[in-house]
Amino acid sequence: MKITYHKLKMPLISPFTTSFGTDINKDVYVFKLEHNGITAYSESVTDENPFYGSEDNYTVFHIVKQYLAPVVKGLPEPDEFNEQVKFIKGNNMAKASMEMLLYDYYAKANKKSLVDYIGHSRGYANVGISLGMDDINVTLKKIQEALDRGYKRIKVKIMKGKEIGILSAVRDNFPDIVLSADANSDYTEKDFDLIEKIDRYNLVYLEQPLYHDDIIYHSRLAKELSTPLCLDESITSPEKAQKAFEMGACKVINIKEGRLGGIGNSLKVMGIVKEFKGHVWIGGMLETGIGRSFNVSMASLSDINYPGDTSPNDKYFKNDIVKNPFTMENGTIKPNKGTGIGVEISEEYLKKYTVEEGIIA
């Protein structure tokens, strides 16, 4: 058994801007497990800075090498792994990178695709697009291009002071599209009056307007809005999802497997959303074709009832590290049919983008 890593620096096709910064590259750790003729892959959704959450590439590598990889070497099944690493507080993205590595391994060991190993897939994922902040005219052009390609939901990034202009322009030009907005926790409880102005734009939901770890203020804001709230950063466990619905803090949850600690916790959150008759979708973190394959598989599950941020690979990368990138047809993407996550790695581009590599365990 061997666990290795590649740290990659992959240039994005265009800069991606949110309320907390602009990405021009995707800096990512890709992990590989080799055992008994099976090769499994995963990646970490962190980057170089702890701006989305508290983890970054440096913390993930430390936690994986010192604590998680030794557990993975025992080849526990994913649920067993989650139980065995409970003693480690937080560090969900590190945990997810190893849990999902085990999911790929065991799906392949059982000669099943990941979706068949998990179960309850409808066979396709409905696709939405997330657009970073940009010049208004550029954004309008990107929206038209996305609609022409068949995307089923448009999401625009906003921040305090730059929300009314973009939302007004989008609604003036596209009055009937399925539209959402994501603030990435840029507002505070002092901004309720400003946020309430967003109601006029008929959004399907407003995503994470307040603090990244908050439920209480979101529950208060929800009472003032007709627009449903979607929580992203705040939902780091099934327990927090339960509390959020009980307190009325949201009607929608954006699931990111990395943020929740892996597929197991993500499935639990789906069950909670279903119990409360809410809505749920699969988000994205500018993943490579490896992480994107996990996302598409999850987004195809029958309990997912909103389009997710599961764009084809060419949305972000000119050349991905997989030879079989996803393509979209009529606003849907089908999971890979091969065993596990079903990706074929391009050794050419893996080598081209690698800035560091080595053995972890």
Feature annotation, model-predicted:
Residues 5, 34, 39-109:
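Metal- or metallocofactor-binding catalytic centers and their adjacent structured scaffolds
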Residues 42, 125-131, 152-156, 179-183, ...:
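Hydrophobic faces of well-ordered beta-strands that scaffold small-molecule active sites
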Residues 1-12, 23, 28, 36, ...:
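Flexible C-terminal active-site loop/helix
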Residues 15-20:
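Short, P/G- and charge-enriched loop/turn segments at secondary-structure junctions
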Residues 31, 37, 98, 111, ...:
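Conserved, mostly hydrophobic/aromatic
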Residues 213-230, 235-332:
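Shared catalytic-loop signature of beta/alpha-barrel
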Residues 65-69, 99-104, 168-171, 196, ...:
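Predominant activation on well-ordered alpha-helical scaffold segments within soluble catalytic domains
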Residues 116-225:
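Metal-dependent enolase-superfamily TIM-barrel catalytic cores that perform enediolate-based chemistry
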